[in-house]
């Protein structure tokens, strides 16, 4: 091969490599429209939605731990409330510091058949929007078991392997040891997590009866069998989020 041919081949290779690299960079840097639309603009409306979400969380906690024995409870959260709360109280109370390193600006989009979770990973030019599509349902044959089916995992517009996410989820559950167990299986090639609440309790004190998705909202319904025992078993997961109930 002549020197001229070699230089031409190298030049073509470099152009192709740069083109592939630029394409991958553009795919990773792509910001999904749903993620952008999920952001609630700052202002009085967002503040009110954040307060509504915080109040609903506090009422949910109170319902679960203070209702009379066997009394039913139910609560509804909209994705606008959740995203407003994540942008306001979640930040002001410094709860965002508990997010894994590199993750910021989480947002949710709730649809009738799935929940879309997205967040920014990294910062500046080296950041990307990671989006996760989840189908969610209560397992009928077992009490207090929620199934999460991971049907989509992207960095920008680029599909990526879910293995690292699965390992991270397993580690988090093992670290906390809060009576929540998780098992995995595959359905139609997609990983499915079976999340068991009060997994170590032979007689659960909290019974989930309904988790229903609709356009822009999620309903949660259940009842508590023994509120006093449940209060002793759980640490308040909302901590500084709680509002005074008096």
Language model features: what each stretch is:
Residues 2-246:
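Extracellular/lumenal and peripheral-membrane lipid-interaction modules
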């Amino acid at each position: 091969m002549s020197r001229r041919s070699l230089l031409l081949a190298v030049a073509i290779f470099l152009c192709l490599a740069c083109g592939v690299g630029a394409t991958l960079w553009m795919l990773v840097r792509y910001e999904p429209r749903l993620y952008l639309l999920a952001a609630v603009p700052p202002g009085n409306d967002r503040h009110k939605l954040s307060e509504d979400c915080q109040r609903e969380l506090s009422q949910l906690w109170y319902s679960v731990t203070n209702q009379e024995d066997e009394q039913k409870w139910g609560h509804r959260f909209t994705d606008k409330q959740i995203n407003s709360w994540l942008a306001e109280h979640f930040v002001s109370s410094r709860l965002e510091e508990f997010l894994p390193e590199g993750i910021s600006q989480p947002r949710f989009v709730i649809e009738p058949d799935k929940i879309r979770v997205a967040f920014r990973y990294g910062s500046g030019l080296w950041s990307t929007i990671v989006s996760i599509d989840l189908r969610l349902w209560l397992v009928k044959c077992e009490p207090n078991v929620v199934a999460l089916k991971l049907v989509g995992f992207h960095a920008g517009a680029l599909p990526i392997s879910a293995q690292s996410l699965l390992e991270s989820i397993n580690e988090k559950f093992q670290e906390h040891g809060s009576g929540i167990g998780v098992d995995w299986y595959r359905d139609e090639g997609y990983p499915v997590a079976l999340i068991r609440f009060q997994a170590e309790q032979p007689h659960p004190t909290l019974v989930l009866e309904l988790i229903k998705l609709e356009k822009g909202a999620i309903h949660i319904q259940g009842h508590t069998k023994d509120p006093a025992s449940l209060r002793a078993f759980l640490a308040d997961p909302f901590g500084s989020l709680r509002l005074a109930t008096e």
